[in-house]
Amino acid sequence: IRDRFIYPPMNAHIKLPKQLDGSKGFITVELAHSNPNATIFWHLDDTYQTQTQDFHKISLQPAPGKHSLTAVDGEGNTVSTTFFIE
């Protein structure tokens, strides 16, 4: 599959930033897809999150620990990555 995650890379260890009010921040994940018109369905730890068209970038707020991120296009092609939130 030619599609790939721009961020996060496989097995990345990520520290979420703190917001100005001290609350937990977000991670922004991004996918490069070979078809610019594709619809992407995003899943974090096998739970559907959202879908994107045109710009394949979303923000997530996962709990500390290991996570699996999977993107599925409208044709059923999938690409996955694993990352760790510290």
Protein language model regions, located:
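Soluble, non-transmembrane domains of envelope/secretory-pathway proteins that act on or interact
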Residues: 1-86
